[in-house]
Amino acid sequence: MNNVTPLHHLYVHIPFCHRICPYCSFHKHTPGGTDITAFVDALLKEVEKQPLKPKTIFFGGGTPTMLSDTHLERLLRGLKERLDLGELVEFTVEANPRTVTPSKAAVMRGMGVTRVSLGIQAWDDATLKTLGRDHSPAEAEETWQVLRDAKFPSLNLDLMFSIPGQELETWRQNLEHSLSLKPDHISAYNLNYEEDTDFFRRLQKGEFRTDESRDTDFFHLAIDLLEANGFEHYEISNYANAGHRSLHNEAYWLGADYLGIGPGAFSTIKGRRWKNVPDTDRYIALTLSGGSTVTDVEELTIEHRRTERFGLELRTKRGLPLDLIALDQRRMLDTLRDQGLLDYNETFVWLTRTGKSLVDPIAVALMGEA
């Protein structure tokens, strides 16, 4: 064990939500019937299975702040007791409006959480209703103020755009209101229609429609407005003030190994990827009895890993290493640069403002796939 290199990135999946949003495909459910104490114990037992010396920890979900103050403190304290946190530089917890009280914020801050990502999604009632969110704009602002008062070093707002019925001017107002709150980071996601969601079924029925031109207009408005206000557009969906990039997500985008614990969580370690069983009660029973929660093990081929690097690293401001592009495909670089879609130097290839809205087809073109 002493010869094993410890992992530096830990993801903890907490699947509980007040209600199930119609666009979300992550493993999640309401907490009714789940033994939350046993769930926390299972997480703490699982985290001991791999050597860890985390530089980043990320609590995602679901809604991690659905845990009570007592359970959240038990989990955070348990991690501190079990892990060497001497190199920890970022500890993020996702939260939703109405789930953070001053006492819960104090628990998180006191236990070493450095960053909170608040899932606002929108600031207007009509869009929130379409998204099936269970908070009002006023409740979102109240939660934001609680987090500000707790003096977390870094706060993020999560927003979504290109939502059915959403107008471009409404999106502008959402962005401007977000800026007025002075967040350290903003994530702005184009709505995706994921399989096994209510939104996907409505898309299939023709109730919703996609429009790439509309998506681009919303995307470019976000870029222009956020950059004009000093934010660095460092990844397709992410904007940060200086010193406030998401280090955990950056590690993922750049291909670092990571351990995921909790039901439905993915891990990628030394070319192997697996998922935990996406059933919370079964996850608890297996973990506490000493059984294996691992399912869907996948050995990542060199080509698979190369494809992922194109898809992820091209999304970043730094761009894709030039040496990943086959020599016979590099003629495409000048063609795409002449079209105003990318630029490059002797080390990296990166997308322009126009190219960022076409990241997927550009990645395919550079990989040389049909």
Which role fits each region the language model picked out?
Residues D338-T347:
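A short, conserved structural fragment
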